[in-house]
């Protein structure tokens, strides 16, 4: 939510006020959290969070349940709700050391967010409460509290890299001393991932940094406890961008029904399913995740809590759109695109530094119209506000695509003339998708695509193929993201243009490469079947059957690999 780091919660954290969310106040100077504070927090005991248990020292029978819930919510990246659970446990038993440990833990960084400096004081104070109470806790609890002590400082440096490395070292020592403690191993894996979020493989898809240790650690946990939700979740993230995402399929299958009350954990299998060509499974995972999130938000009775509904909830709709698009389900894609756009429609925020990525997700409805050839709907979209150059660029792209398809080539030329300077403007490189990659990538792919479509419409196929080759180079350079940073594979267009040009052997090579990158997608299978037919190759029959299977949930009949 993300990263985006897939949806960067670090950026979204600043909009808590827009979400009508009451964050937990700093801990009181007294040992207990005051009842008024807890009323503001609005914690709920939730159903469907599994049966994971971490025994803690407490005198109150209900505290253990609140703590276990907080831990599972932490494993499911709903950190705000986890914080409320831990603080509720601390209210019920102010002498519970691990309750304060949890309330401190969740304020730290994770793979989808850096730490908010505004949380430093709370994290430190809660840690000190845990440390002061540790002598009354078990040896195991003391070990976890001691490891967390390396994560924070009373006066932290502006660059907290040294603290994050110290915490990773402390969790490694914790796991070394407690080799049978699976939670210790999971926290070690997460601490190592936090040192290189969403950057686990090099350009050759070889593991980099701590990735090999992360994978080995998580596989060791899963071998001993195949249903450890925290390990399964992190393992999906650890292998999804690898050269062999199939190795995460068993973890994905186990995770999809393991914690039905956690929308994010229900959604996570889609990250593997999309990488291995199980597109309908990705659709179903996101549909179920949306249902789980709807139930969770309904329980909150309108008190939309924290960054979870601003990051993770829209991510499920966006991913549903992506998966539905790849299996040709136009009606579902249209509905989920609209839901994504609606949730990203934060007009003031998307104009602020650091939040330009919202523009990209707000435009999902426009991308969907291009993807499925809803040209009349595109023509009716008014010119956007001029202070959003990326939005303006994509508007010209969509209008130009509609004009080409409606044989209004002069209009398409006019839109391309407006799109080109916007895409080339160096200022576009400063508009980032959640601090990971510039919106300029998408704008430049859009410009290359329109250039190619216009050339193809005029029979200039060499020029079209060259422009699309440049677009593919840009697309391939976008860092790994799910859904990808461009709405539809450029190779879908290149293959179609090559077939149109009577170059089926070249088209075949393009489609095979695209199927290597996005296995089992019907668009490429359709194009591959046509390219094989054009060459008289008998394999076309088998590929056509694969297309029919991939397209079993589709509601459109394609005539090419792009509309």
Language-model segment annotations:
Residues 18-20:
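C-terminal motif of bacterial Sec signal peptides marking the signal peptidase cleavage site
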Residues 61-69, 95-110, 136-156, 180-201, ...:
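Amphipathic alpha-helical repeat scaffolds of TPR domains
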Residues 67, 101-102, 186, 233-234, ...:
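Alpha-solenoid helical repeat scaffolds
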Residues 79, 113, 120, 164, ...:
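TPR-repeat structural position
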Residues 91, 175-177, 222-224, 254-261, ...:
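Solenoid-like repeat scaffolds
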Residues 97, 104, 108, 118-135, ...:
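TPR/TPR-like (Sel1-like) alpha-helical repeat modules
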